From Swiss-Prot:
Role summary: Provides the cells with the ability to utilize trehalose at high osmolarity by splitting it into glucose molecules that can subsequently be taken up by the phosphotransferase-mediated uptake system.
Pfam families: Trehalase
PROSITE patterns membership: TREHALASE_1, TREHALASE_2
Gene3D superfamilies in UniProt: 1.50.10.10
Listed transmembrane segments: none
Record protein name field: Periplasmic trehalase
GO biological process: cellular hyperosmotic response; trehalose catabolic process
Cellular localization per UniProt: Periplasm
Species per Swiss-Prot/TrEMBL record: Salmonella agona (strain SL483)
Amino acid sequence: MIPPEIRRSVLLQKAIKLALAGTLLTFASFSATAADPSSDTETPQPPDILLGPLFNDVQNAKLFPDQKTFADAIPNSDPLMILADYRMQRNQSGFDLRHFVDVNFTLPKAGEKYVPPAGQSLREHIDGLWPVLTRSTKNVEKWDSLLPLPESYVVPGGRFREIYYWDSYFTMLGLAESGHWDKVADMVANFGYEIDAWGHIPNGNRTYYLSRSQPPFFAFMVELLAQHEGDDALKEYLPQLQKEYAYWMEGVETLQPGQQNQRVVKLEDGSVLNRYWDDRDTPRPESWVEDIATAKSNPNRPATEIYRDLRSAAASGWDFSSRWMDNPQQLSTIRTTTIVPVDLNALLYQLEKTLARASAAAGDRAKASQYDALANARQKAIEMHLWNNKEGWYADYDLQNNKIRNQLTAAALFPLYVNAAAKDRAAKVAAAAQAHLLQPGGLATTSVKSGQQWDAPNGWAPLQWVAAEGLQNYGQDDVAMEVTWRFLTNVQHTYDREKKLVEKYDVSSTGTGGGGGEYPLQDGFGWTNGVTLKMLDLICPQEKPCDSVPSTRPASLSATPTKTPSAATQ
C-alpha cells in the first residue's frame, strides 16, 4: 500500500492559513517508497499546486535557463511552511528570490559529462552507456516531484532525468539487442506498477506528468518481453493491459455519435477512435513561462484551451509540430484535442490485438474474441476515416471540420507498423514517404519547416524504426533499406565527429544533430541508442554482425522476423 498521508497539526494548519492570507493549498498523499500500489492511492500534486504563487514567481523570474530545473527541485521542508515564509519575506527590503530558493530547495544536480574511452565503435559506445543511463528511485525524498519505481530503469539522458513512457520501448529494443533482458523485465514491471498505482502510464515518473499519458507502447513492451519469456509474460501483464485499455476508452459507453470524452471520440457514423488529452488546462510546470507566453500571443482564444492543447501535444510525444497547428508559424493556433491522430489509433489497434492474444494465452477465448472484434472495428475505422484517398496516404482526422487532414507526416507509417493497412494502400504510403519525406539523412518527420522540433528538417529514431519495420511488413524492402541506411549513416557521421548519440538529427544532410523546440539538443540518448543497435543488426548478417555502420550500403536488409499482415489487411 502507498504510505499514509503527510500529517500536520491543526495548529500548523491555522498558522499557515494566516500566513497565506486565507489561501490554503491542500496536499494529497503520495508515496515516498515504491510499495505495492492499491486502489486507494491518491494522486500526488505537482509543484505548481504545492507551491502556488512561489512557483509562479520563481518561473516568471526566469532564475534558471531551463524551466524544468525548478519543477524538479525538492523542497527542504513542508511546502506550506516554505510558502508561509515566502509570504512574510517577499516584500521585505533586500529580499533575494534566488537566495530564498537556494536555502529552501535542493536543486537537481547537473549530470556528469560522460567521456567515452577512445577508439570505441558505435556498438561499444552504446553498450558502455547502458549503466551510465540506468537509475534507481525506489525511495525518493519527501515532496520530490519524482515518483518512485520498484525497479531500476534507463533514462533518455541530458535534462531528462526520469523514465519516459514511449521513449522506453525503443530503449528496450536496444537493451534486448545487448542481451540485457533483466533490464527489459524491470522496465516492464515498472510500467505495470504505474498502471496499478495511477490507472495509466504517465508521460514520465514526475508528479507534473500524471495528468497525461504518452503514445501507448505498453503492449509492444509486453510482446517484446514475451519473445524472451514466452506466453507467461502475456498472462502476467494481462490485468495491466486491460487497465491501460480502460484508461484510453473511459467514457465510451455513454458517448453519442458526434461526441467526445477525454481520450475517446465517437464519429457521426458511430466509429470509435481516440485522441490525445491532458486532464489539466494550466501551463506545464516544466515549461511554465513558455506556455504563458504562447497563450498571451493569441488573445482570441481562452488561455485554458491553449494550455490543454499544448499539454495534449506533449501527450502525443510530438511536442511540437505543425501537425497540430492551423498556422505552422504560430504555436498558439495549436488544437491537438480536435485532431484524431492516425498513429495513436494504430497503437490502440495493436493494444487490442495484444489483449486478444493475452486473453487466449490465459484460456479466455470469449474475451479474446471480444478484443479481436474491437480491433477489427478500429481497423475499419482507420481505413474509413484516417485514409486520405485524394493524396494517397494515412493522415489525421479533423474533428473541428469533420474531414481528413491533408498533411503527410511520418505518422502515416504507423498503420503499416501494426499491420492494419490494406496492401495496396501500404504501397501508396511507401511511395509517398519516399517522394516527400525521405532525405539524405533519413526520414523527415514532416515536410514543413516551422521551427518546431517535430517538423522538417528533423528526423527521430523511433519514427525511423516504425517506418523501416512497417515498410518491411508489406514487402517494401528497398524503401525500408533506404530509411535504415540513411539514418544510420547520419548517426555514424555525427558520432565520428562528436563521439555521442543525440535525441534527434537533421536529416537534410548527414552528421548533424537536430534543432528547434523548447530546449537545447540533448545527448545520451536512450531511444537513438536502441534503434541504432536494432538497425545495425538489420543491415548486417547475423553470422557477421557489425559494430559500426559499413562504409558501403548493403544490398538488402538482413532476414529478421517481422509481423505478417493479417488476413483482414491483405
